[in-house]
Curated annotation (Swiss-Prot):
Gene it is expressed from: aroQ
Protein name: 3-dehydroquinate dehydratase
Keywords in alphabetical order: Amino-acid biosynthesis, Aromatic amino acid biosynthesis, Lyase
InterPro entries cross-referenced by the UniProt entry: DHquinase_II, DHquinase_II_CS, DHquinase_II_sf
UniProt pathway: Metabolic intermediate biosynthesis; chorismate biosynthesis; chorismate from D-erythrose 4-phosphate and phosphoenolpyruvate: step 3/7
Amino acid sequence: MADKFHILVLNGPNLNMLGTREPEKYGSLTLSEIVNRLSTEATSLNVELDHFQSNAEYAIIDRIHQAKDTVDYILINPAAFTHTSVAIRDALLAVSIPFIEIHLSNVHAREPFRHHSYLSDIAAGVICGLGADGYSYALQTAVKRLSQSH
């Protein structure tokens, strides 16, 4: 592949607390450790990877808007915004960038309010319950799909 693909990784609220926050559900890796591993993998795949985490919905929306015309694919763990944010859904629709929704835990095996996602039906794919490996699987899938379409 001649040109680098540009992939944006977005992480929502409370994911900055990974490593200490309910490790039995979310694992013991910190968000920095997950992103560092993913960055190493991205380099080996000739991918430019950017990461952004925020506990603020508007900041995630602003970053999605900034991605228009510069990002080829988005990997997003919307965390609690999965179940509440029509605004993030609308932002993703507005920029028309394909994305994969990621969840560390199996949201379908948890409380009923976590079973609904405002993003899943418009996502290129959804990965849940595979822990930090889900980010790697999402990256590999995004690169494969981008390679097939370019």
